Amino acid sequence: MLQPPKIVAELSANHNQDLNLAKESLHAIKESGADFVKLQTYTPSCMTLNSKEDPFIIQGTLWDKENLYELYQKASTPLEWHAELFELARKLDLGIFSSPFSSQALELLESLNCPMYKIASFEIVDLDLIEKAARTQKPIILSSGIATHTELQDAISLCRRVNNFDITLLKCVSAYPSKIEDANLLSMVKLGEIFGVKFGLSDHTIGSLCPILATTLGASMIEKHFILNKSLQTPDSAFSMDFNGFKSMVEAIKQSVLALGEEEPRINPKTLEKRRFFARSLFVIKDIQKGEALTENNIKALRPNLGLHPKFYKEILGQKASKFLKANTPLSADDIERSL
C-alpha cells in the first residue's frame, strides 16, 4: 500500500514580522494535520547587498520593482525567534525544520538540533553550504526549481560523497504563483528515477489539485506555503494556502492514499457479505420429482446466492433429480443423481 507523504507547511514570510502571529500559525498548522512546519533561516545581508542600483530591483515577478534587500527584510524570520519557535513546535508535537541560506544559519539550526535541512533551488549553486548541511548526516531535501540537471547531479553527488544518502528531491516550479499547466508532475517521478532518490512536490499553484495528484504518483513529501488567513498581506500571501484550505488538502491527501489501496486485485472483504444476497445461484422454480430431468423450465439462475454456481447450469441440464425438489428452493450438488 502507498505510504502517505509527509506534509510540510512552509511558513516563510507569512508571520508578517509578528512573533505572536508566527506562534499562532504553528498552532494552526498543527491543527491542520500537517507533519512539519518549515522556516527559512537567513538575514538580508547574507542574501544580497543593500543597494538601490538597477540590478538589485526585481523585475517581472510577484515582487516587481521591489528592492531585493528590502524584500528580504520583510520576508525573513528573525534569527532570535528560532529558538522559541522550535521549542513551541516540539511542545505541540509538530515537526520543525528549516532552509539555511548561509553557514551561520546552519550553525544556528544545528544548535537547535534541527532534524533535517532543505536547500532552496536558488541555493543549489552553493556547494559549500550543501556540503556542510550534508555532513551533519541529517536528511537533505533539495528543490528542483531553477536548478539545471547538472546542478542537481552535482548537489546529489556531493551529498553521497560525504556518505549522506537520505536525499529527497522536490519538484518545484519557481513561479509565484505557478500555473497548473506548468506543473509537469510526471517529471517529478522521472527525477526520482534519474537520480535514485525519494521524490516529492514543493507546490506554488493555487489550490490542492497538484498536491493530491503528486500523492497518487508516489510523492514522499508535499510542501505548501501556509498562511493563517488570506486577509493578511505578506510577501507570500498571493500563493499561500489558508488554514481551511490546508486542512482540507491534508484530509484529501489522506483520502487519496486510502482510495489508491493496493495493487493486488481482490474482492473487498466488506463486499463479500453483499455477494450472499445479490449474486445469482441456481434455484428450483417448479416442483421436480425424483428421477425427473432438470430443464430450462424447472431450474433458473436467480438471487440470492444460496445454490449452485450458475456456471454449472448447462452441465446439469438433462441430469436427473436425486430426490423430490420443492419449488423456490436452492439447488445443491446433492440434489442431482450424478454428483458434480
From Swiss-Prot:
Domain called AFP-like: residue spans: 281-337
Gene transcribed to yield this protein: pseI
Recorded GO MF terms: metal ion binding; N-acylneuraminate-9-phosphate synthase activity
Gene Ontology biological-process entries: carbohydrate biosynthetic process; glycosylation
Described function: Catalyzes the fifth step in the biosynthesis of pseudaminic acid, a sialic-acid-like sugar that is used to modify flagellin. Catalyzes the condensation of phosphoenolpyruvate with 2,4-diacetamido-2,4,6-trideoxy-beta-l-altropyranose, forming pseudaminic acid.
Pfam families listed in its UniProt record: NeuB, SAF
Protein family (similarity comment): Belongs to the pseudaminic acid synthase family.
PROSITE patterns in the cross-refs: AFP_LIKE
Domain of life: Bacteria
Catalytic reaction(s) noted: 2,4-diacetamido-2,4,6-trideoxy-beta-L-altrose + phosphoenolpyruvate + H2O = pseudaminate + phosphate
Annotated EC: 2.5.1.97
Protein name per the record: Pseudaminic acid synthase
